Amino acid sequence: MSKDSVETNTIINTIDNTNDNTTNITKKNSVEEIITLNDFSTALGDESKGLVIIDFFTTWCGPCKRIAPDYIRMAEKYPTVSFYKINAENENLANIVAACEIVSLPTFCFFKAGKYIGRFVNADPVGLEKSIVESSQ
């Protein structure tokens, strides 16, 4: 997992500068899909959640499709971690995608206590799981 230049404050300011009060988080298996900015705020807002992972994907991305079953399996294996996904083409979340500096797919962003702590960019399930274990400690 890499720590990069994404600033938690930039992400939070992006959320704060919206008037979206709608919550539409949809749960598929043990991974919840974030659809609105309010969903994103809700996902990160509870600092007691511990580790939160967000998978940025698109429906046409081959590597995203390949790792999706592994991501679901990891969500079931690590129940103390909160697993989410965001379609990077969702226009409602374009500001979040930009603030998180998503330039390659899939990208998994890691947050702890509401703060950005790093990312894993690859469709490698072994590497992703290693990053989850390391970030959980």
Curated annotation (Swiss-Prot):
<comment type="similarity">
    <text>Belongs to the thioredoxin family.</text>
</comment>
<feature type="active site" description="Nucleophile">
    <location>
        <position position="61"/>
    </location>
</feature>
<feature type="domain" description="Thioredoxin">
    <location>
        <begin position="2"/>
        <end position="137"/>
    </location>
</feature>
<keyword id="KW-0249">Electron transport</keyword>
<keyword id="KW-0813">Transport</keyword>
<keyword id="KW-1015">Disulfide bond</keyword>
<feature type="site" description="Contributes to redox potential value">
    <location>
        <position position="62"/>
    </location>
</feature>
<feature type="disulfide bond" description="Redox-active">
    <location>
        <begin position="61"/>
        <end position="64"/>
    </location>
</feature>
<comment type="function">
    <text>Participates in various redox reactions through the reversible oxidation of its active center dithiol to a disulfide and catalyzes dithiol-disulfide exchange reactions.</text>
</comment>
<dbReference type="InterPro" id="IPR013766">
    <property type="entry name" value="Thioredoxin_domain"/>
</dbReference>
<feature type="site" description="Contributes to redox potential value">
    <location>
        <position position="63"/>
    </location>
</feature>
<dbReference type="Pfam" id="PF00085">
    <property type="entry name" value="Thioredoxin"/>
</dbReference>
<protein>
    <recommendedName>
        <fullName>Thioredoxin-like protein R548</fullName>
    </recommendedName>
</protein>
<dbReference type="InterPro" id="IPR036249">
    <property type="entry name" value="Thioredoxin-like_sf"/>
</dbReference>
<feature type="site" description="Deprotonates C-terminal active site Cys">
    <location>
        <position position="55"/>
    </location>
</feature>
<feature type="active site" description="Nucleophile">
    <location>
        <position position="64"/>
    </location>
</feature>
<keyword id="KW-0676">Redox-active center</keyword>
<dbReference type="InterPro" id="IPR017937">
    <property type="entry name" value="Thioredoxin_CS"/>
</dbReference>
